[in-house]
Amino acid sequence: MKASIYDFTLKELSQLLKPSFRAKQLYLWLYAKYKTSFKDMQNNFSKDFIAYLEQEFTLRTIEITHVRESVDGSKKYLFKSLRDNHTFEAVLLKMKDKKIDEETNAILEGEKYTVCVSCQIGCQVGCAFCFTQKGGFVRNLKASEIIQQALLIKEDNNLPIEKALNIVFMGMGEPLNNLDEVCKAIEIFNTGMQISPKRITISTSGVADEIPILAGKNLGVQLAISLHAVDDKTRSSLMPLNKKYNIECVLNEVRKWPLEQRKRVMFEYLLIKDLNDSLDCAKKLLKLLNGIKSKVNLILFNPHEGSKFERPSLESARMFADFLNSKGLLCTIRESKALDIEAACGQLREKKLSQQI
């Protein structure tokens, strides 16, 4: 089976292709011009070189099979692997962006885009509140399949080449259980799609053994920890992984995470009605995160088929956030984008091609 050209970093292609400058030319065609056929690259390459590329590599290995758009402008994408027909989802989040013109001080309004990518088909972690785990675990995604999610979404929305994207590994799967492919994808996002590591966030359920390995790679990405509870009993009931890596174990590794000045580790906290949304929980969370340069992102539980949990009121979420902010712990409430198309946090899963998304 031919390798996908999207699986190769710039360094790897430079070592593989002769002369080595061909690698940069090829990257330009792939990531700046969205070319999906080697024959479309004839301006730079000889017929012999194109024949070599066609013999050794393939290009697109996934395709968009369905798109569903939310009233807020967000879109949920169903992708299909062209190799094994398995499906997975990703989401484009569209938000308003305001900037101040340095010369005129005028407020400039625009739009910013975040792509929530998947790194696995299914998930091994088995969080009780997450719809992804109901489909079971199928396999890891390759770097090329991660990259193509963002590439195809950008192409589908006619976003200019120079339009910066934010990338969040918050789709299907646990990034630290597919760390090699995730790290390779991050390198390609940076050198190929020109996405700064500062615009990339890896969200983990807390695979503590892998956190120092990720830190040692010095990728410069943002780290987010899915905490969701303030005691081990509750967290273990929500996240079975906690029985192996409890709260103390995870926080010990987070304390060692290298932070740039002014940067913080994000803690994601899913608020579930009458389970972890009380003021007492907020007080315990404040104590847990003492000494960690952090911020808390509250997420109101997003309902899905078969779930026993309930979404808390916005009022209780605001009380929770107001308490933490009043004590100096930065806390925000995440806006539930794409809730109407079941593309919000915890609502993605593999679907059969006959299913509607």
Curated annotation (Swiss-Prot):
InterPro entries assigned to the protein according to its UniProt record, in alphabetical order: Aldolase_TIM (IPR013785), Methyltransferase_A (IPR040072), RlmN_N (IPR048641), RNA_MTrfase_RlmN (IPR027492), rRNA_lsu_MTrfase_RlmN/Cfr (IPR004383), rSAM (IPR007197)
GO BP annotation list: rRNA base methylation; tRNA methylation
Binding site for S-adenosyl-L-methionine: 173-174, 203, 226-228, 302
Cofactor: [4Fe-4S] cluster
Keywords, in A-Z order: 4Fe-4S, Cytoplasm, Disulfide bond, Iron, Iron-sulfur, Metal-binding, Methyltransferase, rRNA processing, S-adenosyl-L-methionine, Transferase, tRNA processing
Catalyzed chemical reaction(s): adenosine(2503) in 23S rRNA + 2 reduced [2Fe-2S]-[ferredoxin] + 2 S-adenosyl-L-methionine = 2-methyladenosine(2503) in 23S rRNA + 5'-deoxyadenosine + L-methionine + 2 oxidized [2Fe-2S]-[ferredoxin] + S-adenosyl-L-homocysteine; adenosine(37) in tRNA + 2 reduced [2Fe-2S]-[ferredoxin] + 2 S-adenosyl-L-methionine = 2-methyladenosine(37) in tRNA + 5'-deoxyadenosine + L-methionine + 2 oxidized [2Fe-2S]-[ferredoxin] + S-adenosyl-L-homocysteine
GO annotation, cellular component aspect: cytoplasm
Disulphide bridges, residue numbers: 116-345
Any Pfam family the entry gives: Radical_SAM
Location in the cell: Cytoplasm
GO molecular function, one term: rRNA (adenine(2503)-C2-)-methyltransferase activity
EC number: 2.1.1.192
Primary localisation category: cytoplasm
Binding residues for [4Fe-4S] cluster: 123, 127, 130
Radical SAM core domain: residues covered: 109-340
Cofactor remark from the record: Binds 1 [4Fe-4S] cluster. The cluster is coordinated with 3 cysteines and an exchangeable S-adenosyl-L-methionine.
Note, other: Reaction proceeds by a ping-pong mechanism involving intermediate methylation of a conserved cysteine residue.
Matches recorded under NCBIfam families: rRNA_mod_RlmN
Function: Specifically methylates position 2 of adenine 2503 in 23S rRNA and position 2 of adenine 37 in tRNAs. m2A2503 modification seems to play a crucial role in the proofreading step occurring at the peptidyl transferase center and thus would serve to optimize ribosomal fidelity.
Name this polypeptide is given: Dual-specificity RNA methyltransferase RlmN
Highest classification ranks of the organism: Bacteria, Pseudomonadati, Campylobacterota, Epsilonproteobacteria, Campylobacterales
